[in-house]
Amino acid sequence: MRTYLYCEAGFVEKAQWLPNSWVNVVCPNNDDFEFLTQTLNVPESFLNDIADTDERPRTDTEGNWLLTILRIPMQNGQNESLPFGTVPIGIITNNEIIVSVCYHNTDLLPDFIEHTRRKGIEVRNKLDLILRLIYSSAVWFLKYLKQINLDISAAEKELERSIRNEDLLRLMRLQKTLVYFNTSIRGNEVMIGKLQSIFQDTDFLDKELVEDVIIELKQAFNTVNIYSDILTGTMDAF
């Protein structure tokens, strides 16, 4: 599914694509692939890279196209082994095209779009969009970390009453989730430096926004480490 979004004091959905709009593609189907590769001439190799669930944060170029891959958090379904995970999102840009592609439904993207409308945020260019998506990823990491902390506390209380394999396995799953969060947050933080280097000679770089993003990511990173230490201590005690 794809939507065409224009920034008018926040992103507003329109019926058709025009240059410099944001094409947001989630769980792409054949029609989306055809539009991206045939109409916009997006490199097919970029779409294949984003489809790899293990893809790490990085940048790549092909001709005048830039691919930026980030990892964003998502809440898994009840049938999944881990309560939360991270998935790749790719932002593909050239001089007049901005496309984001994610092969998974997440809470982050609709919340981000709604947030720009609610706050009347003016997203000035493609770098602005990428940085704000990184910021939003940090916000959602922190939201899910609060839920993880509640799960840790609940499991601890159960273990105080009686030691059960089920509760220990629950803690192990949370510990694995924190490892994935840690790796993804660090990878997204590295991307900020790469993007600064790529856009250093342009008017796109907003140093104040960059600083805000770094601060939010560091808060998420520090929170992950605190919860990891708590979890390790709890599991060692039992």
Regions found by a protein language model. Name each.
Residues 26-27, 103, 135, 172-175:
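Conserved residues at beta->alpha junctions
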